Curated annotation (Swiss-Prot):
One of its GO terms (molecular function) is large ribosomal subunit rRNA binding. One of its GO terms (cellular component) is cytosolic large ribosomal subunit. InterPro entries: Ribosomal_uL11 (IPR000911), Ribosomal_uL11_bac-typ (IPR006519), Ribosomal_uL11_C (IPR020783), Ribosomal_uL11_C_sf (IPR036769), Ribosomal_uL11_CS (IPR020785), Ribosomal_uL11_N (IPR020784), Ribosomal_uL11_N_sf (IPR036796). It comes from the Bacteria. Residues 89-108 are annotated as: Disordered. Keywords: Methylation, Ribonucleoprotein, Ribosomal protein, RNA-binding, rRNA-binding. This is Large ribosomal subunit protein uL11. PROSITE patterns: RIBOSOMAL_L11.
Length: 148
């Protein structure tokens, strides 16, 4: 079995990894072939590239400088912004400046449930209901109102 020398966590745009920061410096420190990672990551995330999603990735680096990586689901905040119509290719909207007082968008309970189902594999929540509450909390802290 190969010995693990490091683990790198990054959040990269789907299908658009390139050797520029943050990818190059993070992988360069561990002696990983940067272009090889970029090619593999872009191929693995090509399907999500059209949606302009940010994909968290955990890269495990081994002693012989080889690597493996695991793709996670996009952050709940990105999925919520997309559902509320705040996140597009050209417009990278942010949440409210004063959450609780200011509302920047709305999502339905059905959309919250869909996001919770998507995120379940990466969450510690035991039930769909618990995952939905977590996503609702994220929405409220961003100033996104939940309707329906």
């Amino acid at each position: 079995m190969k010995k693990v020398t490091g683990q790198i966590k990054l959040q990269l745009p789907a299908g658009k990894a390139n050797p520029a920061p943050p990818v190059g410096p993070a992988l360069g420190q561990h002696g990983v072939n940067i272009m090889e990672f970029c090619k593999q990551f872009n191929a693995a995330t090509q399907a999500q590239a059209k949606e302009a999603l940010i994909i968290p990735v955990i890269i495990t680096v081994y002693q012989d400088r080889s690597f493996t990586f695991v793709l996670k689901t996009p952050p709940a905040a990105i999925l919520l912004k997309k559902a509320a119509g705040l996140h597009t290719e050209k417009k990278k909207g942010s949440g409210a400046h004063k959450p609780g007082k200011e509302k920047v968008g709305q999502v339905t309970r059905k959309q919250v449930e869909q996001i919770a189902k998507t995120k379940m594999q990466d969450m510690t929540a035991g039930t769909l209901e618990a995952a939905m509450r977590t996503v609702e909390g994220t929405a409220l802290s961003m100033g996104i109102e939940i309707v329906g």
